[in-house]
Amino acid sequence: MPKDKLKTIYVCNQCGETSPRWLGRCPSCGAWNTMTEDVVAEPAKSSSGRAAAPVRVTGQTSLKPLKLKNVSTTEEKSRIVTGIAELDRVLGGGIVLGSVILIGGEPGIGKSTILLQLCGEVSRTRSVLYVTGEESVRQIKLRAVRLDVPQDNISIVAESDVDEICGLIEQMKPDLVVIDSIQTMRCTDVASSSGTVSQVKESSARFLNVAKTNEIPTFIVGHVNKDGAIAGPKVMEHIVDTVLYFEGDKTLPYRVLRAVKNRYGSTNEIGMFDMTGKGLEQIENPSQVMLEGRPIGISGTCVACVMEGTRPVMSAIQALVTKTAFPSPRRTASGFDYNRMYLLLAVLEKRAGYVFGNQDVYINIIGGLKLDETACDLPVCLAMASSLLDLPVPEKTLAIGEVGLGGEVRSVPHLENRLREAQRVGFDTAIVPKHNLNMLDAAQFPGLRLVGVAYLREAINAIKINK
């Protein structure tokens, strides 16, 4: 019988497009430098040279479909509450049975730490299997001792053979499985090394099949590439149920867990953690943490209140506007949309009369948050105007509102929740859209002065930073 031949192909790790030769740019998705080498088996032709005969449909099958009405949807039975409230929030209330959850993040950000702590919490009442392909069993033990993780119901195995691991899962039937990491796993019947597109794709598919068949929730750790996306084919993110990103500056203790895909919950929720010597600790009051250490009495700072899912979070926005010596001024934004910053600068120039053409502009969101909500437009504009005029925004004043191209301040959703959070934290003045204010009862917020503005110029005058 003829054997399969091996051939080298190049696969785009963004869209999965294949090519017989290397290309600098993927012809399908247009991404640059994403074609990676892979080795696949090419089926050999028969001695007669004929194509394989088509599969004959017999009309017989062993499949037994269920009536949809008979499928159990009881929440208590379909989810596992982890005991880590911030993680449960991001997942939509707990881990769904049989779900496959992919978690990615930069090296050293804390992926293995949070999963080991998760195993410890779940193991209090259930059995857990932790599979490591990167560390030895002894190394995992040392970390578990440092984190003070319960160890009675946690089984650990150092293995990278996917078929062996799947067989072990079928045999043990644990209540939770952790695979750390998918880039170290390999299928022996796939003719390529670990971490290649073919290996990652096939390994993910086999783990998915075992998880769905046995209703065992499975966490898979994925490495990220230089652009911050999870390394490997995009099909891996498509087939899993949930994709989580663990974000944060490694020089700071704060970590943010964010869902970019979630079949069983919202993708707008975030979980916040503090990295300590004893592992990750939950941050139950993120607004207070985000505002800690913000400069007082210095120009260029304005406080915003953003909605992260159902949770309002206060965040300090910093702007630095300085005169440039070069013909092309520099624009930099960290944690805020770069193109949105350009739009707001244009509105400030056209509608408010400020000149930024000879100024470098830098925007930074304190605490490592990424603000993509249009309700941050007004505080960003006020921060830039404050820095340009070198006049500080009052310490206990926050701003909420979307800014249109005409300089108008547009209404935002969930304003009541934002104002309650501002009141709880201790702010005394809130600059809000006038349209929103007309529909609010100011008596609900004693001690918080509400200032309604219809245009950007009114907001600047309201906080008295206009010369």
PLM regions with names:
Residues 137:
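Divalent metal-dependent catalytic cores for phosphoryl transfer on phosphate-bearing substrates
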Residues 106, 133:
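P-loop (Walker A) phosphate-binding loop of NTP-binding proteins
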Residues 128-132:
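Conserved RecA-like ASCE P-loop NTPase motor core of nucleic-acid helicases/translocases
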Residues 4-14, 18-89, 96-102, 109-120, ...:
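Peripheral, non-AAA+ core regions of ATP-driven protein-machinery
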